[in-house]
Amino acid sequence: MPDLRWKAYGVAALIFALDRFTKWLVETNVSVMDTYHVIPGFFDIVHSENRGVAFGILNDSTSEWRTTILVVLAGAAVIFIAAMLWNAQRLDRASFWGLSLILGGAAGNVFDRAMFGKVTDFLDLYYRDYHWHTFNVADSAIVVGSCLLLIDLLRPKRQAANVS
């Protein structure tokens, strides 16, 4: 398992770097709330700033503690996931990838919130009147990682053969 630990942290670091790079590209090239139509009627790049959590929850909160509380809670989750990876004796492939993706995505969003007090979102999917909430690479990694963990949880485990 020691080799896998470093691979997991490497995957997380790549997700973190990709997330930070894409946010930087948007922050330096797209004004807040400007829109670039990538696939008209389906996908846009829209620079938005989220001071809350997923789906804009707490975005309108005026509490001076909002950012501190969110950084502490999400930071604790990052530490917990990193410790799970470090202490794991064995991980199925789906759990390995799932935890690695979640760790990288969560670290990316925690970094932004701690450094800037907000998270930059820019990926905008929609179809006609249906509009998904704007998100970023870190959010995508967290969702894909969570799905992989769910698949691993629901997938039947192989039973050891009975030798008697």
UniProtKB/Swiss-Prot annotation:
Question: Where are the catalytic residues?
Answer: D121, D139
Q: Where in the cell is it found?
A: Cell inner membrane
Transmembrane ranges, per UniProt, are 68-88, 96-116, 134-154
Q: According to the UniProt record, what class of enzyme is this?
A: hydrolase
What Pfam families does its record include?
Peptidase_A8
GO biological process per UniProt: proteolysis
Q: Does the keyword Nucleus apply?
A: no
Q: List UniProt keywords, sorted A-Z.
A: Aspartyl protease, Cell inner membrane, Cell membrane, Hydrolase, Membrane, Protease, Transmembrane, Transmembrane helix
Q: Which GO terms describe its cellular component?
A: plasma membrane
- The EC code for this enzyme is 3.4.23.36
Listed pathway(s)? Protein modification; lipoprotein biosynthesis (signal peptide cleavage)
The GO molecular function terms of this record are: aspartic-type endopeptidase activity
Instruction: Tell me the domain of life.
Output: Bacteria
Q: Supply the InterPro entries for this chain.
A: Peptidase_A8
Catalyzed reactions per annotation? Release of signal peptides from bacterial membrane prolipoproteins. Hydrolyzes -Xaa-Yaa-Zaa-|-(S,diacylglyceryl)Cys-, in which Xaa is hydrophobic (preferably Leu), and Yaa (Ala or Ser) and Zaa (Gly or Ala) have small, neutral side chains
**Coiled-coil residue windows:** none
What membrane topology does the annotation report for this chain? Multi-pass membrane protein
Its biological purpose is as follows: This protein specifically catalyzes the removal of signal peptides from prolipoproteins.
The entry assigns this protein to a family as follows: Belongs to the peptidase A8 family.
Official protein name in the record: Lipoprotein signal peptidase
